[in-house]
Regions:
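Iron-sulfur-associated redox domains of electron-transfer enzymes in respiratory
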Residues: 1-189
Length: 189
């Protein structure tokens, strides 16, 4: 029992950024006013519940968890995929994705290590396939503004991307979202 391999979800983030950059260019060419990321399931839920007029602006691109799990299943359909991450909103995302079998929080995996008396710092290093190296922008997805930057560096004309970072779904962040909803609905030019 245990894990036989690990893949960095940042590889999936690179795929997401590639696809979101293409989608952004297509949307802007057809005259859309704006596009938002789809990478955070809590953000997408907040838009659905509180700013539904902005929903059409949310990217159709799948999230990094999906793409990395898909790659793992394509290597071997019998592989069991377990996403380990800090965000509890990822649990629902994993439950809704056919390529993801399980989701553990960082806290849960830490508790498992303690229960099994595994000292991670004392474990022998394992060689990893150097072809599976994510880009810096893929690794920075979780940083505030990281998704927008990853998309920007992939655009044919990066100067066309004017990004606004909404850091958190607190009252200030929700007010910013509401303002973008008004722009999308035409209530504000």
């Amino acid at each position: 029992a245990g894990f036989s391999d690990a893949k960095e979800v940042a590889l999936g983030a690179d795929i997401t950024a590639d696809k979101e950059a293409k989608e952004f260019e297509e949307r802007m060419e057809r005259g859309d006013k704006l596009m938002t990321t789809s990478c955070c399931p809590a953000y997408v839920r907040a838009v659905k519940l509180h700013v539904p007029e902005l929903l059409a602006c949310v990217s159709d691109t799948r999230r990094p968890m999906h793409y990395i799990a898909q790659l793992v299943k394509e290597e071997n359909p019998e592989n069991v995929t377990v996403f380990i991450g800090p965000c509890l909103a990822k649990r629902k995302e994993g439950m809704d994705d056919d390529f993801v079998d399980y989701v553990l929080s960082v806290e849960e995996i830490g508790a498992l290590f303690i229960a099994k008396k595994i000292d991670v710092a004392r474990q022998e290093a394992v060689e990893h396939n150097i072809n599976d190296v994510a880009t810096a922008s893929g690794r920075n997805f979780a940083v505030s503004g990281g998704v927008a930057e990853a998309v920007r560096v992939r655009l044919k004309h990066p100067e066309n991307l004017r990004s606004t970072v909404i850091n958190g779904l607190n009252s200030a962040g929700m007010k910013q979202l509401a303002q973008f909803g008004k722009i999308q609905s035409g209530a504000v030019p």
